[in-house]
Amino acid sequence: MKLYKINQGIIIEASEKFYLSNTKSWDAYINQDNLFEVISTDVQSLTEISWNYEGILAPIENQEIWASGVTYMRSREARMEESQDSGGADFYAKVYEAERPELFFKSTAARCVGTGEKVRIRKDSKWNVPEPELTLFITSSGKIVGYTIGNDMSSRDIEGENPLYLPQAKSYDKAAAIGPCLYVPKDVINPDTQISIEILRNGNLMFSGNISINRIKRKLADLAHYLFREMSFPNGAFLMTGTGIVPDNDFTLLSGDVVNITIEGIGTLSNEVE
């Protein structure tokens, strides 16, 4: 099942039918450990409506967005390449093998955008890429109950100059996009699920790639555990789980590019670059 956030409330998609939830609070509704069961019960008493996916907002209200780094081999390679001259390559090699994952703060809801909105590239950066990522929704008790698509916009030249510049390379206005919905399955997401991306420039395909989430180095539950180990999230939290798709080093995003990220079972997150 899927939940869509709109100005009028919450749209539930179940068995290819749509329902407008009686619940108005996004925070309260999604932050339930038994969310799948709650939705299943709710749709039994709701009236089916006609809806054509208009007015979709980012599926976030008062949550924070965090992110994981170097969780796929391709990400490890790319980080090592961009930081070779600064002497930081070893840090990425070590964190890929370490027990403790790399976690960093990505965005507040106010800085985040949803599908159909524009993401940004930093004005002081010349090498920027999108990073397509499966994104977890974790309740305040630490349970993974849903998934969405994340675009972790990144300034590779800034992070490559010095690993300590990562917060500037990763966190700025409109550097995070999530959506289009919160996917709430009965069981954990299928490990064979495919993530794919295409980048269009003036209608022409500039880059595409895909990867299965079973290629991730770490268990999703372990990433969630480390995030919640010493922090509380009263409304739950979103956690991007890292990327396994990185364009070649000669590619950078330009204003006007369109980034489409698709994850099987969830949908497509589409954003133009500002």
Model-inferred region functions:
Residues 38-201:
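Active-site microenvironments in enzyme catalytic cores
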Residues 1-73, 270-274:
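Generic N-terminal segment detector
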Residues 18, 36, 91, 104-105, ...:
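Phenylalanine-focused residue identity feature
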Residues 7-8, 13-17, 138-143, 200-203, ...:
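Short acidic-glycine loop/turn motifs at beta-strand connectors
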Residues 1, 15-16, 26, 33, ...:
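Generic intrinsically disordered, low-complexity segments enriched for polar/acidic and small residues
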Residues 7-8, 132-134, 257:
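Residue-level marker for the onset of beta-strands and adjacent loop->beta junctions
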Residues 156-274:
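Catalytic-pocket segment enriched in acidic/His residues
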